Amino acid sequence: MATFLHTMVRITDPERSRSFYEALGFRFSREMDIVRSGVLEATNYFFSIGDQENVLELTYNHDGRSYKLGTGYGHIALGVADLDGTLAALKDAHGIEPERPPYQVGSGGTRICFMRDPDDYRIELIERSGG
């Protein structure tokens, strides 16, 4: 049986992305340079959250190429205990606003909202009922 290991997204500014994901509670774990034929091609930055190790990999390619998000990409979903507090912290630290205000889904009190990370990847924040 397979186990989930990590999600990788390409980034354009390692420091900006690191600061953003740390504001969401991720911990920087390690970085790994990818060198081929003596040329530094990419640096992978790994992040952990809670007791889950190295679940997010941010890849910076050193050749300066740009990327377009594919049409098949949806979003990364993250659970938060305090949706309003998380949004306030992201606004203060990064000027990030949700796509629309948080809203309730279903009848159980769960609230969600969507936002974009510094490289325009869509992030869903989920506050389950009861915090």
Residue ranges of each PLM-predicted region?
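Short, P/G- and charge-enriched loop/turn segments at secondary-structure junctions
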Residues: 34, 64-65
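Conserved catalytic-core motifs of GNAT/GCN5-like acyltransferases
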Residues: 27-37, 101-105, 126-130
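Core segments of cupin and vicinal oxygen chelate
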Residues: 2, 8-53
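GNAT/GCN5-related N-acetyltransferase fold signature
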Residues: 47, 115, 125-128
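Vicinal oxygen chelate
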Residues: 12-15, 52-53, 65-122
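Short beta-strand segments enriched in hydrophobic/aromatic residues
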Residues: 11, 62, 127-129
